[in-house]
Amino acid sequence: MDSQPQSKKAARGADKTARNPIPIIPAPTERLPKPQWLRVRSPLSPEVDQLKKILRDAALHTVCEEASCPNLGECFGGGTATFMILGDICTRRCPFCDVAHGRPEAPDPLESVHLARTVASMKLRFVVITSVDRDDLRDGGARHFAEVISALREHCPELHVEILVPDFRGRVANALAAFRETPPDVFNHNLETVPRLYLQARPGADYHHSLQLLAAFKAQHPQIPTKSGLMLGLGEEIDEIRGVMRDLRQAGCELLTIGQYLAPSRHHLPVARFVPPEEFQQLQRDGMAMGFRHVASGPLVRSSYHAERSFHEIGGD
C-alpha cells in the first residue's frame, strides 16, 4: 500500500512544533479555564453553513476557519469573511498558529478570478485578503496578492481591499514592487508579540524586519493606512507592549489591533494569562494618545475584526 501524505491534523499539532528552536511542552489536560468575557456563541447557524458552502464551491479558504478564530460565528453569521489565498499550508512553524505546516502546492492561477466572483456574488463592500507564509516563492506570494487585488477591483469596483501580508523574509524589494501599481486600501502586517518572545513565538521571523516592512511600504505609499496586530497572554509585560506600540508609530503605522491569545491545542504555546478587559481598554487609550488613528483593543479582537469599521472611522471612502 502506498504511504499517505501527512494529514493536516498532524501538521497542525505536535509534528508542527516539534522542531522549533524552543520546544513546546504539551500542556496538561486541564488548561487555564476561560473567563466569562472570552465565551462566544457556537458558530453553528444557517448563515454560517451557507457561507461555508459558497466558499467550498469556489474552492476558497478563510483564515476564520483555518486559524480557528473565536469570532467565526459573528463574522460568518453576518455574511462576511477574511479570505486566505495561496493555499492553506504554511512554510513556517509558528507555535501560536493553528494553520497547518508543510510543503504547499503551487499557487492556483485561477484563484483571483474565483475569489473575485465569489465576493461579487456575496455583495461585499470590504474584504480582507491574507495568506500563509510562502517562503518557497521568489516574491513570497506578493504578485499573487496583486493579481487578487486587480481581479477584485475589476469585478467589484466599489470594493475596498485590506491585505494582511506575511513578512516576505528576504524578498521585501520584490514584494513591494508587486504592489507599486496595485496597492491595497489598507496594508496590514502583524508584529504579533514583543521582541523578547520572538524566538519562542515566531521562529523564522525577525521583529525589526517586520517593522521595516511596514515602514518601507508607508514610505512608498504615504497616503495608504498601515496596520498591525498584537496578541496578549504569551508572557509579555504590558510595558513591553507599549514599547512595541511606540516602535509601530515610529514606523508610520496608523491602525492597531490588540487581542487575547488563545492556544489552539495543548501542543501549541500555552496561554500564560488571560488579560482582563480593563487592561485592553487602557492600551486602547494609550494607543490613541501615541497618535494611532484607530485602536481596536479587547479580548476577542483579531486582526481583521471590524476591519471595515476602522477603515471608515479614519475617513476611508
From Swiss-Prot:
Binding residues for [4Fe-4S] cluster 1: C64, C69, C75, S304
Name of the top EC class for this enzyme: transferase
Localisation: Cytoplasm
Annotated keywords: 4Fe-4S, Cytoplasm, Iron, Iron-sulfur, Metal-binding, S-adenosyl-L-methionine, Transferase
Pfam families recorded: LIAS_N, Radical_SAM
Entry's Gene Ontology molecular function annotations: 4 iron, 4 sulfur cluster binding; lipoate synthase activity; metal ion binding
Known EC number: 2.8.1.8
Biological pathway: Protein modification; protein lipoylation via endogenous pathway; protein N(6)-(lipoyl)lysine from octanoyl-[acyl-carrier-protein]: step 2/2
Co-factor binding comment: Binds 2 [4Fe-4S] clusters per subunit. One cluster is coordinated with 3 cysteines and an exchangeable S-adenosyl-L-methionine.
Record: residues binding [4Fe-4S] cluster 2: C90, C94, C97
Location, primary (coarse class): cytoplasm
Required cofactor names: [4Fe-4S] cluster
Region feature Disordered, mapped onto this chain: 1-28
Start and end residues of each Radical SAM core domain: 76-293
Gene Ontology cellular component terms for the protein in this record: cytoplasm
Enzymatic reactions: [[Fe-S] cluster scaffold protein carrying a second [4Fe-4S](2+) cluster] + N(6)-octanoyl-L-lysyl-[protein] + 2 oxidized [2Fe-2S]-[ferredoxin] + 2 S-adenosyl-L-methionine + 4 H(+) = [[Fe-S] cluster scaffold protein] + N(6)-[(R)-dihydrolipoyl]-L-lysyl-[protein] + 4 Fe(3+) + 2 hydrogen sulfide + 2 5'-deoxyadenosine + 2 L-methionine + 2 reduced [2Fe-2S]-[ferredoxin]
Listed PANTHER family: LIPOYL SYNTHASE (PTHR10949), LIPOYL SYNTHASE, MITOCHONDRIAL (PTHR10949:SF0)
Family: Belongs to the radical SAM superfamily. Lipoyl synthase family.
Entries under NCBIfam families matching the protein: lipA (TIGR00510), PRK05481.1 (NF004019), PRK12928.1 (NF009544)
UniProt-recorded name of the protein: Lipoyl synthase
Name of the coding gene: lipA
